[in-house]
Design a protein with these regions (language model features):
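His/Asp/Glu-rich metal-coordinating catalytic cores
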Residues: 1-159
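A contiguous, basic/glycine-rich beta-loop/short-helix subdomain that forms a polymer-engagement track
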Residues: 59, 173-185
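Short, conserved secondary-structure transition motifs
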Residues: 141-142, 161-175
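Feature recognizes metal-dependent phosphohydrolase scaffolds
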Residues: 159-160, 179
Length: 185
């Protein structure tokens, strides 16, 4: 989403497709925005062009795209995380594509459980030693996942405090559980 303003300033005038949550989160609003309908994750524009999309498990609003044009299939996804503690993911297993573009800054999924345990163990060690624990996180994405991880790990033993913006996001997502797991809201 960070390149949209740059692209439009350099002549791009086409539609920009995104989820409603993403639109709410970004500062620069594209001139020609198309909002995805969460009740219709598949769209056939004509016989030669179809679009399917799903949640990536990265943050509220993050989606992957599966586009078919003239019989060719393209898969695009930013960060993708199955089994996230907070966010839902629509698995992409079984999809095949002629071209896949994947921007993934996180560790492999087979290491995610061990990585979360190591983070929780380090936090527990610090808290048990009465050390302060401050975790600067982005306003969207892993901050809520980490809060959920710590709550699942520590329960009520250590209270979790978060910025007003992060707390507001938690409450806002709680009214619409489309991107977050229902059992945690």
């Amino acid at each position: 989403t960070g390149a949209i303003e740059y692209l439009e300033n350099n002549g791009f005038t086409g539609p920009v497709l995104m989820s409603n949550q993403t639109y709410q989160q970004i500062h620069y609003k594209p001139k020609n925005t198309m909002i995805l309908d969460s009740t219709a994750p598949e769209l056939s524009l004509d016989g030669e062009l179809s679009l399917r999309w799903g949640r990536t498990g990265h943050c509220a609003g993050a989606v992957w795209y599966y586009i078919t044009v003239d019989g060719k299939r393209l898969f695009f996804s930013g960060d993708y995380r199955e089994n996230d503690t907070f966010y839902r993911c629509d698995a992409v297993r079984g999809l095949t594509a002629d071209l896949a573009v994947i921007d993934s800054a996180y560790s492999r999924m087979d290491r995610a459980k061990d990585m979360r345990k190591a983070v929780a163990d380090a936090a527990k060690d610090a808290l048990s030693a009465s050390a302060p624990l401050l975790l600067p996180v982005p306003s969207y994405g892993r901050g809520l996942s980490m809060a959920m991880l710590f709550y699942q790990t520590f329960g009520e033993a250590y209270p979790i405090h978060m910025s007003a913006k992060l707390r507001d996001q938690w409450l806002r997502i709680g009214h619409r559980s489309y991107f977050a797991h229902e059992e945690i809201l």
